[in-house]
Amino acid sequence: MVKETHRFETFTEEPIRLIGEEGEWLGDFPLDLEGEKLRRLYRDMLAARMLDERYTILIRTGKTSFIAPAAGHEAAQVAIAHAIRPGFDWVFPYYRDHGLALALGIPLKELLGQMLATKADPNKGRQMPEHPGSKALNFFTVASPIASHVPPAAGAAISMKLLRTGQVAVCTFGDGATSEGDWYAGINFAAVQGAPAVFIAENNFYAISVDYRHQTHSPTIADKAHAFGIPGYLVDGMDVLASYYVVKEAVERARRGEGPSLVELRVYRYGPHSSADDDSRYRPKEEVAFWRKKDPIPRFRRFLEARGLWNEEWEEDVREEIRAELERGLKEAEEAGPVPPEWMFEDVFAEKPWHLLRQEALLKEEL
């Protein structure tokens, strides 16, 4: 647990970094996280990567119809999950946040059930894959239209302020969202109202095929916070500790009633934008190889190893545990069975009107 709030500089030219490329500690304050916490961060990152790999298998075997790979985002997403109060604070995620969902505690049965559209999906198979939600964990159901969840996040945060709940709304998005009108409207509204919100850009430098330099003339996304009169933090999002400490500072700042912040976590997606994308058409292999050398998982592994918190035997034990959890979650999701067609009539009206009852009866006759 963080014993005190560490003040980080806003609007820096270079990303805030606490772990060097070789795993060395770069912070100007003593590390105050215990070994078990550090190991948990690593395990969650590993689980996020392995879940991502399992999603790829699902699409290639025809068990799902869409994926949005997130390899390279693990440090950022796991850090966010650990920096908030799961089930108390609210999360307004975007479609690449399955690592965040898993680290927050959404069961694998539900995540995989959502990918397969089985009865294990709390959304009853109504969303396209990669669009989970969790009422129990205050995890807002993912919306496809880019940045459309930013105004609802602002509105939720304002309600938290008015009701004095002590909660914080955390809203994540990709770099492409920052070119949408909803993004500006939502953050401006939250800033004007002093809402307890943290807006986090997982900047992987590509909005599908549009690279960052064609997305905006702003040097950084964090710089855009100037327009709203709120703090803007530029962070190395492939550094799990820098991401954790900065996001936690922004969250606690919001919780104290000091208003919203904008955090830019610079990451890189190793895979395509989605299963509908061929990333070799717009980015060179050399670029991907360059970023592969900055992989957040080996980087944090070196950090742990230097502190006697990692060895190959422990790594294999953890991987085996995660494999077993993935197999069990997939088995439970598949055994739940497909969503029945008649479910389409549920949750449409509080009380089914006559015409809906009629349609339901006609469907049952056909079935």
From Swiss-Prot:
Superkingdom of the source? Bacteria
Q: Which reaction does it catalyse?
A: N(6)-[(R)-lipoyl]-L-lysyl-[protein] + 3-methyl-2-oxobutanoate + H(+) = N(6)-[(R)-S(8)-2-methylpropanoyldihydrolipoyl]-L-lysyl-[protein] + CO2
GO biological process, alphabetically ordered: branched-chain amino acid catabolic process
Please provide the record's keywords in A-Z order: Magnesium, Metal-binding, Oxidoreductase, Thiamine pyrophosphate
Q: What is its EC number?
A: 1.2.4.4
Positions binding substrate in this chain are: F66, Y95, M128, P129, E130, H131, S144
Against InterPro entries, the record matches this protein to: Alpha-ketoacid_DH_E1_comp (IPR050771), DH_E1 (IPR001017), THDP-binding (IPR029061)
What EC class is this?
oxidoreductase
Binding site residues for thiamine diphosphate: 94-96, 144-146, 174-180, 204-208, 273
Subunit structure of this entry?
Heterotetramer of two alpha and two beta chains. Directly associated with ODBB in the E1 complex.
Q: What does this protein do?
A: The branched-chain alpha-keto dehydrogenase complex catalyzes the overall conversion of alpha-keto acids to acyl-CoA and CO(2). It contains multiple copies of three enzymatic components: branched-chain alpha-keto acid decarboxylase (E1), lipoamide acyltransferase (E2) and lipoamide dehydrogenase (E3).
Q: Which family does it belong to?
A: Belongs to the BCKDHA family.
PANTHER family (UniProt xref):
2-OXOISOVALERATE DEHYDROGENASE SUBUNIT ALPHA, MITOCHONDRIAL (PTHR43380:SF1)
Protein name (record):
2-oxoisovalerate dehydrogenase subunit alpha
